[in-house]
């Protein structure tokens, strides 16, 4: 086991604080509409330019082990806030730094760290309650656009695009962000349920120009197993032919004789038909087939539930207004499922999302939820250079997360104003002077985001904060982008409650841990032993070759 170095008390806290300051000072320059960029060196390719706090925080690694511990713990504040709310990472970092700085001073002055922590926790709880009380629910698409614009650092076109996407796919719909191949940023919406399986044979195509199969008002057979011969399928095929409607077969696979027979029937014109593989794998495939069945008011034909292919009747098949099948994707539009059954399934998936601990499972469940509840929108981010596209994509991701958070828990006045007001409204009392000091630490720290936004804009922070606090209206604040004071909600300068409260809760949680640190242990860095010099004298037996 390698030797360890141990630091105690004041020295330990000072080293931690130094690490916190290095990371926070790099991150906080990005805060606000006039925040600056940070350039991050990459070991290959062009450097990355970003205004996203968590991206900067993740890149910082310090040489000194003890300072690095402080930096990594503050990085955790940004990461946690990003995981919960998807935005507000810079605000969280600024709050964390402010609480740690004040807390370390208080401990150095002889106050009890545990009482300070209790005071900090009590103050944070009251501020969060205050934020919920002041929250304004989001109703209109214009309000969603405002939130997106603020989070994208004032880019109105990004805010509007996100609002359009949310309007089209609903609040539950999936909105993904991709890099475009062109200079334009565009929005593409896929309505209905789409899964990534295309037709099994190009002979199923109905539109040879576009190479797609369009089925209008089809029956949909959802089968869990492989189909290799059609003997057992004949009764249902005959019933479909008599009805004059097209048929879509979704099965694990359609092979050999079965596929050949379907293609021959299609080419002879007797049967409008297409077959696709079932989406997903294993248990996820079963769940997705069940989703399709509920969406189309059909049944999954499976021997698990005692239904054999030969006994299938038309009423067991799903229905939809239209099915569009390309080489790679199948889209079911306007399924005939009952609204109540779809809603019950949506609620069931929501419960699974809450309970799952795996990020991958959560992502897949959210995709299923979106396909059932609304649809899928893709925002393709364009730009003149790769560096610009990556920077813009960071901002779109932030804006998207912020708008989702705003829809969930409402909005408050932006620009750090809500926290300023909450600091003024703090009434909680500590049970001893040290707890009071903890409450005052939070009271002062709550001014930090507003001050930093003003500083980044080249303003005098103390004057701006003073003017804002002179007016008692909750939503009165400073619009840094235009340099005017006014009602921030009316001006569209808003922050989602979820982002603001997550930033504060995570900052206080990690900062409290740093303040209550009394000892630190780190490995002693290994000293590199120099490589011994080559023995002189040239090669043996070849005297006289010394150089």
Curated annotation (Swiss-Prot):
GO biological process: protein refolding
Annotated positions binding ATP: 30-33, 51, 87-91, 415, 495
Pfam family, one: Cpn60_TCP1
Alphabetized UniProt keyword annotations: ATP-binding, Chaperone, Cytoplasm, Isomerase, Nucleotide-binding, Stress response
GO MF, any single term: unfolded protein binding
Reaction(s) the record says it catalyses: ATP + H2O + a folded polypeptide = ADP + phosphate + an unfolded polypeptide
Keyword Cell inner membrane: no
Region ranges (Disordered): 526-547
Biased composition (Gly residues): 536-547
Enzyme Commission number(s): 5.6.1.7
Gene3D superfamilies hit by this protein: GroEL, GroEL-like equatorial domain, TCP-1-like chaperonin intermediate domain
Localization, UniProt: Cytoplasm
Protein's UniProt keywords contain Plastid: no
GO cellular component: cytoplasm
Oligomeric form and interacting partners: Forms a cylinder of 14 subunits composed of two heptameric rings stacked back-to-back. Interacts with the co-chaperonin GroES.
Functional description taken from the UniProt entry: Together with its co-chaperonin GroES, plays an essential role in assisting protein folding. The GroEL-GroES system forms a nano-cage that allows encapsulation of the non-native substrate proteins and provides a physical environment optimized to promote and accelerate protein folding.
Similarity section: Belongs to the chaperonin (HSP60) family.
NCBIfam families to which the protein is assigned, alphabetical: GroEL, PRK00013.1, PRK12849.1, PRK12850.1, PRK12851.1
The protein's name in its UniProt record: Chaperonin GroEL
Organism: Bartonella henselae (strain ATCC 49882 / DSM 28221 / CCUG 30454 / Houston 1)
Gene that produces this protein: groEL
């Amino acid at each position: 086991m390698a030797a360890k170095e141990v630091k105690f008390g004041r020295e330990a806290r000072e080293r931690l604080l130094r690490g916190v300051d290095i990371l926070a000072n790099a991150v906080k320059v990005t805060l606000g509409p006039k925040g600056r960029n940070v350039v991050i060196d990459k070991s290959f390719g062009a450097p990355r330019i970003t205004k996203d706090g968590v991206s900067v925080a993740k890149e910082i690694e310090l040489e000194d082990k003890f300072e690095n511990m402080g930096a990594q713990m503050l990085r955790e504040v940004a990461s946690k806030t990003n995981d919960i709310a998807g935005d507000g990472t810079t605000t969280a970092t600024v709050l964390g730094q402010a609480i740690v700085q004040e807390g370390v001073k208080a401990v150095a002055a002889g106050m009890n760290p545990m009482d300070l922590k209790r005071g900090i926790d009590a103050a944070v709880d009251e501020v969060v309650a205050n934020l919920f009380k002041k929250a304004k629910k989001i109703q209109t698409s214009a309000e969603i656009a405002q939130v997106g614009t603020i989070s994208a650092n004032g880019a109105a076109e990004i805010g509007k695009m996100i609002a359009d996407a949310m309007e089209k796919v609903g609040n539950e719909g999936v909105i993904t962000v991709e890099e475009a191949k062109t200079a334009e940023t565009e929005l593409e919406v896929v309505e209905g349920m789409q899964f990534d399986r295309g037709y099994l044979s190009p002979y199923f195509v109905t539109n040879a120009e576009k190479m797609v199969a369009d089925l209008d008002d089809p029956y949909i057979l959802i089968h869990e197993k492989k189909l290799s011969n059609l003997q057992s399928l004949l009764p249902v095929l005959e019933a479909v032919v008599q009805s004059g409607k097209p048929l879509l077969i979704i099965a694990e696979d359609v092979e050999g004789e079965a596929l050949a027979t379907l293609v021959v029937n299609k080419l002879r014109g007797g049967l409008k038909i297409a077959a696709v593989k079932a989406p997903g794998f294993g248990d996820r495939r079963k769940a997705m087939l069940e989703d399709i069945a509920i969406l189309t008011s059909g049944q999954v034909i499976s021997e698990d539930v005692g239904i054999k292919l030969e006994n299938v009747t038309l009423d067991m098949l799903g229905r939809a207004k239209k099915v569009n099948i390309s080489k790679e994707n199948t889209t079911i539009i306007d399924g005939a499922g009952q609204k109540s059954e779809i809603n019950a399934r949506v609620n069931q998936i929501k419960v699974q999302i809450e309970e799952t601990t795996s990020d991958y499972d959560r992502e897949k469940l959210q995709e299923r939820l979106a396909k059932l509840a609304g649809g899928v929108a893709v925002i393709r981010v364009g730009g003149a250079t790769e560096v610009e596209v990556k920077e813009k994509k960071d901002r779109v991701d932030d804006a998207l997360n912020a708008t989702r958070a705003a829809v969930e828990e409402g909005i408050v006045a932006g620009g750090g104003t809500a926290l300023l007001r909450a600091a003024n409204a703090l009434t909680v009392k500590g049970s001893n002077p040290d707890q009071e000091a903890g409450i005052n630490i939070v009271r002062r720290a709550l001014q930090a985001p507003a001050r930093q936004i003003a500083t980044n804009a080249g303003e005098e922070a103390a004057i701006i904060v003073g003017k804002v606090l002179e007016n008692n209206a909750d939503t009165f604040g400073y619009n840094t982008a235009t340099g005017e004071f006014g009602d921030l909600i009316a001006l569209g300068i808003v922050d989602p409650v979820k982002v603001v409260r997550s930033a504060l809760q995570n900052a206080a949680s990690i900062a409290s841990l740093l303040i209550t640190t009394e000892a630190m242990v780190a490995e002693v860095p290994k000293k590199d032993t120099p490589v011994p010099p080559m023995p002189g004298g040239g090669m043996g037996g070849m005297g006289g070759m010394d150089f």
